[in-house]
Amino acid sequence: MLKGDSKEYNLLAKWADQLSPRDFYLSVEIGVREGYGSHVIMENLKNKNHFHIGIDPYGDITYSHVDPQPGIAPRWTDFKGNVLYNPDGSFKTPTYPNSMKQTFLTAFNKHENFILYQLEDIEYFNAFGQGVPIYYKGQKNIINNYDFVHFDGPHTTAAVLHEALFFANRSNPGTRFVFDDIDTYEIEQITQALAHYDFYLIERGKNKMCLERSNGLQKS
């Protein structure tokens, strides 16, 4: 059974479902974990020509999850809300093992228009900065424009900004960006940077926010 470690998946579903019409959609999620976010996106694109990419290194690697706050140690919880501790009693920073990847892939087998790249975001950018090959309906296409991006990997301002700028440079009019856990980093810095690419606010929840790239026409 697929599980999510975030909130407001109903908003994620709505924002994916209401994408502007086009012949083909390429979506991506950074930070797949157990796959529920990717599942929600694909369920709402299943009646359209689409392909979805998941990016997550797994492998129990450690990284900065959120912007540090002086004097405050972040407390992480499991899916049941229990605080995670190390054996010495200190707060534990979560990692995501390869076994989680296998659990996710087993539960995700009905989604055929999907590929998982077991990479860090920067490694994906280095590998596919000139486009990613998509094999779909008997054709190979090198695609370098994305229509829907869910940012749910590292939640630091620097990391999210780097990711957002990569995809902003590879976006289409109507492309939507969804940001998760927006209270853990300086989301205003992200939105200000993306305004230069004509991204504007569609909707903001308590946990998630959606921006869309303008088609160049004046917005009401």
Task: Give residue ranges: language-model regions.
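S-adenosylmethionine/decaboxylated-SAM
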Residues: 3, 10-220
